[in-house]
């Protein structure tokens, strides 16, 4: 048994692999086989179940059930703009003891299509353990 599992699942439709591919290239010391001509990102990156609303909740439910049996605590990070909404989290957490912490920070609005985005994003940290 371990003391803590930290979970930071994808919040939206963008898979982590496409965001962090350069770290993987460095760590593996291997050039990707096929790369997008537009983005330079390897084409083989696939979305996970956490990148889709319909599968994210059930996948998270399964991950929590597995994790709570392996660790005393789970620390989960997720923001208020994520695919899984606050009401969904409340339902997921019904069978656990939860402490919730919130941190507000400035939203990233680098492109024009994000100009209507809220100024602040709320990062929620959930400390989870069995009841």
Positions of predicted regions on the chain:
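Class I S-adenosyl-L-methionine-dependent methyltransferase catalytic core
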Residues: 1-131
